[in-house]
Amino acid sequence: MNRYILIGVVTIISSLAGVSAAYAQSTTLKGHVYTKDGKPAAHVNVLIKEIKRGTVSLEDGSFILENLKEGSYTLFISCIGLQSVERNVHCASNQVCEIDFTLKENETELQEVVVTGSKGLNDRRVSAGKVLIDPMDLPQSTTVIAKNILERQQTLRLSDALMNVNGVYVYGTTGGSQEEIGGRGYAFNNSNTFKNGARYNNAVMPEMSGLEKVEVIKGSAAVLFGNVAAGGVLNLVTKKPRFDQGGELSFRAGSYDLYKPAIDLYGPISKSIAYRVNTSFEKARSFRDEVSSERYYVNPSLLFKLGKKTDVLVEADYLQDKRTSDFGTAAIDYEIADLPRSRFLGASWSYYKTNQSTLTATTTHRINDNWKLNNILSFQQSNIELFGTTRPNASGQMVQSNGDWIRGLQRSKTNEKYYLAQLDLTGQFKTASMKHTLLLGADADRYITDADAFAYINSAIGNKNIYDTINVFDLAKYSQRNDIPNLTSTTLTHTPINRIGVYVQDLVALTEKIKLLAGVRFSYQETGGGYIYNYQNKTETKTDQLSDRAFSPRLGLVYQPTKDISIFSSYSNSFTLNTGTDVNLNPLAPSYIDQYEAGVKTELFGKMLSANITAYQIVNSNLAQMSLTDANGNSNNNANIKELAGEVTSKGLEFDLMSKPIHGFSFIGGYSFNETKYTKSNTYVVGSKLRYNPQHTANASIYYNFNDRGFLKGFNAGILGYYVGERVAGRSTRVQVPNDTYKLMPIPDYFQFDFSVGYTFHQLSLRAKLSNIFNQLSYYVHDDNSINPIAPRQISVTAAVKL
């Protein structure tokens, strides 16, 4: 019933024509900021000196200041590192006053200044929101990890970047091949991870060298995307073509024979076509014995300007990744075994291969200054193959108390194709005295997954899946096999998923201080309707099809007593059509999610420091998670075999701090508290903790740039501290199993400190990073069978030249 009430609220709001108090007669000031070579200048501050009101220019260089009193004003145009510009302007009542500015810098010079980080936490809009809304007007917590942060911290993996976001963390690295991310108590699965606004398969670590920024929307994003899990949404934004000629060549070397050359080139092909090509190659050994990796990445893109109003951006990327599959150390009776950090327990020939390719076309058409159409067409294909020894404690083959472990074999091949079509109309208009920022959209996507299963039967040992026996404490105790057996392909499972959605969202400025965000999405999804082909008896079995449809409403209220304080609250309801099947290969029922969020966003000391605090509660009616056992009661290794575990409730509090550069200093900090428990369940103990989620996380980084400090000019340095609290893994105790042997396994907390230093001289730069300075030890864990130690102390050095 609540959902339908909210739908009605949205409809009423969208049709209002004047029910709030009328504004006094006012004027509007708008214009554009350009570089001296005529290009739009984004992220430039525009300030009215007399009344201390301001804004920031958008990507097209435009700015707008509304509800001004008639009078004369002094406009001050500035950005850290640029020459400021002042102009006097007179604004008449009920008129639109237009004025344009031209900076003294060209586009290249502006790009170099903006990247140094002149924007605060509440200045950074997220493109994943589909409509650009100022964070102070948004009743939701968002974070943007900008290019300058990625560069100065020398991020190599996504986990490095997420150390700047409280409450978002890596909880597992199953097989050493991926980074399983969680937030606010829930996992960010494939449906919650995006690249340039299109869903992205996160079964492999994404390549960071091609990224411009990382966007995080915490909490619900169901109205915008549909079928997303509760914790939040992650959007990876790649580097874009530019109409100025340039680029960078870099080479990175580090501990354990890490070598990574990278090339980034961009420039104009003609007056209306620009290009960018970003490519890298990475090869490394590991602190883990016998483990190595190799990856190649290329990301070409073209930007076509079809007149003044239409842009077409075509982006492609290809990632080839091959690494040793590594399921970490051992656990004995749900306690992590005391083994050397470096000890590898798999076969030396084990591998995990990924080939992933994406093609996306984004068309933007500016109808006029207020309305815009945006279309995304995207295709992605992922081929993933795993072959190696089974995980410790999987398939019933437990590590014994004396360290003996009977190893089996596992192999899987998965091919996934993903298609997306999305169309959005965004615009601004007024009804009476109320200003609307409207989003209307529709999307349709399709997954096709083909998964091959394999079996290994050792006829010499009773037709069991037994490869050999090792002792985890003493690898010399037994003679280890090193041959690669042939595994028989048993079944092919073909699973299509079709989804379509339509949505509307409206941000309504009821008064200058009160804003209402309301939206609703209708989603329809079909899961299943595929088949299972048996290679041995050459039979095909159709799978059941499950279809669901639902409305997902959203309602948020923002109160801004001043321009520097925003108090907000919001409610959203969504449903997740769960992928995968139960142990009997039947489709899963959907999960319904209620989310409540409230908080305060502030800009302090003349907008030099942002400080935000957020509280939330998320209730998942029936959480789908990987099943602990298969249909035969054995330990389950297939991530597509799931169970519905019952109601789970997550409660938490988050605190964020971010400064703009102040005399060379900048600061990022945060703290998160979370408690996620089973609140209704017939499967697990009510009140027991959901696995993998730390109750406390915290982060703090301080960075200093010596740009104007005499002989130290060009030097910069910073330190990052990151804390992850205790959490639990293992297997939750089942209430319906008498004397259940399953139990939770505690994972220790850890503090990690990283130190970075750099030097820039003209076009040359040299950067060094020392990570995990104090050599802290903890683990990324999945169940009790992929317990991967975090990396020890390491050093890396990067040399680069700008072109």
Kindly give the residue locations of the regions a language model identified:
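Acidic, small-polar-rich N-terminal luminal/periplasmic segments of exported/outer-membrane proteins
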Residues: 39-42, 47-52, 66, 80-82, ...
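Membrane-embedded beta-barrel scaffold of Gram-negative outer-membrane proteins
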Residues: 364-368, 372-378, 382-388, 566, ...
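Periplasm-facing N-terminal accessory domains of Gram-negative outer-membrane beta-barrel systems
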Residues: 6, 21-111
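Acidic/polar loop-and-plug regions of large Gram-negative outer-membrane beta-barrel proteins
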Residues: 282, 286, 299-366, 370, ...
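Outer-membrane beta-barrel translocator/receptor signature
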Residues: 210-212, 223-300, 306-310, 357, ...
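C-terminal beta-signal and adjacent terminal beta-strands/loops
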Residues: 621, 667, 722-739, 758-803
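Structural signature of Gram-negative outer-membrane beta-barrels, strongest in the C-terminal barrel
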Residues: 416, 435-437, 443-447, 493-620, ...
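Gram-negative outer-membrane beta-barrel transporters
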Residues: 643-732, 798-802
